[in-house]
Amino acid sequence: MKKAYLTVCSNQQIADRVFQMVLKGELVQGFTTPGQFLHLKVSEAVTPLLRRPISIADVNFEKNEVTIIYRVDGEGTRLLSLKQQGELVDVLGPLGNGFPVNEVQPGKTALLVGGGVGVPPLQELSKRLIEKGVNVIHVLGFQSAKDVFYEEECRQYGDTYVATADGSYGETGFVTDVIKRKKLEFDILLSCGPTPMLKALKQEYAHKEVYLSMEERMGCGIGACFACVCHTNESETSYVKVCLDGPVFKAQEVAL
C-alpha cells in the first residue's frame, strides 16, 4: 500500500451517472490481485473529509495506468466526475485482498457475476483468468438499459449475458434468473455487486465454490475505523473488516 498523486489521463461518462477514469503513476505497479481497490481523496478542501473507495477495473503495467469506474451518488463522487485531464488525485492503494486467481485451475469454467458498479472488477479478473487458460462466462445485472456498461469489454474474454430488472435491455430479470434460464454450468462463481444479489447467489449456489466481493461503506480503508465490518458465520460477535480482510471472501465465511 502506498500513497501518491496520480495524474488524470481521462474521465468520461459511460452510462447513466457512471464514469470511467484512467489514472497514471508509479503506484500502479503495486497492484497484485483483481478485486483490489483504490482510496481516493476527491478534494483538497476540508470537505468531503473521507476518501472514496473505488474498485479497479483494468491495469496497464507498461503505461503505469489504472482504470476505475464509479457512480455519482453524492457530493464526493460528483466532485470526482469534474476532474479534468492533467489534474492530480491523491490516492491510497492498492488496498484489500482480491479474487483467488491462483486457485482456479486451467481448463475450469469460472462464472463471473456483476451487478451495477460491481461489474468493473470483473474486467481485470477476466483478463487474468483467460491468461491462465480458464474458461470465463459473464452475467451482468443492471436496473435498466441506461445503466448498462462494459458489455463489450467483457465479451472479448468470454460469453456475456446482460440482465435488466425492467427488461429494457438483454434478458429480463435478475442475474440469478439468467443463470437458471441459460442453464449455465461452472466450476467456480466469482461475484461483485449489491448485497441482495450476493445473498441470492450465496443461497442458490451453496453447493458450489463461491467468492463474493463485498460493497460496504468505508472510512479509513486500512482497518482502523471499523466502519466496514461484516459479521461472519462463526458467531454473532465475530466479524471481519471488509477493507482489510476483504473485500473478497468465501461465501460461507460471511453472514449476509
From Swiss-Prot:
Changing C220A: No iron-sulfur binding. Pathway: Pyrimidine metabolism; UMP biosynthesis via de novo pathway; orotate from (S)-dihydroorotate (NAD(+) route): step 1/1. Its cofactor is [2Fe-2S] cluster; FAD. [2Fe-2S] cluster binds at C220, C225, C228, C243. Changing C243A: No iron-sulfur binding. Keywords: 2Fe-2S, Electron transport, FAD, Flavoprotein, Iron, Iron-sulfur, Metal-binding, Pyrimidine biosynthesis, Transport. Disruption phenotype: Decreased growth rate in pyrimidine-free medium, extreme derepression of the pyrimidine biosynthetic operon, and decreased, but detectable dihydroorotate dehydrogenase activity. This is Dihydroorotate dehydrogenase B (NAD(+)), electron transfer subunit. It comes from Bacillus subtilis (strain 168).
